[in-house]
Amino acid sequence: MKINRVLLKFRKGLLLPRQLPNIDKIILHHACMNGSIEDVHHLHLSQGWAGIGYNYYIRVDGQVYKGRPLEYIPSHCAKNNASSIGICLEGDFRKVKPTEKQIESLKELVKYLKKTFPNIKNVYNHRDLFKTLCPVVDLKKMIQ
């Protein structure tokens, strides 16, 4: 699985470490916008966060990018951050559907993460765990 890495500078004082064996779920999101991982990172920084809240970001062309390092608690789903991995897909799924390349990359990434973290038992849409429409479409169903 090819995962692209870009240099993202985080606000270190806001990053909290976590225990990787506690990761037991994956939560799926849409970005509600088009843009690069750097664009999302800068948006989250502008909101006073440590940086991008998601662990992975999938562009419309299917390219997968590493976001917040896994050893730090992400910021993507209240009350579930410490025990989850957040994956965000580029796009506003209120207006467009995810691309086939995004869905294929998402399937591959989820499979890779489940193999890497055997305690992962469930994959959720953000809306399954928090009062939101995100990711609008049923990404969980699309990757089954």
Question: Model-flagged regions — what are they?
Answer:
Residues 1-26, 63-64, 83, 89-144:
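Basic/polar, cationic surfaces and motifs that engage anionic cell-wall
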Residues 63, 70-86:
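Short, surface-exposed glycine/acidic/tryptophan-bearing loops
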Residues 42-44, 56, 72-74, 80, ...:
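Generic preference for flexible, low-structure residues
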Residues 36, 46, 75, 83-84, ...:
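Generic serine detector
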Residues 2-5, 9-71:
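Short, conserved "active-site rim" segments that organize catalytic pockets and cofactor/ligand binding
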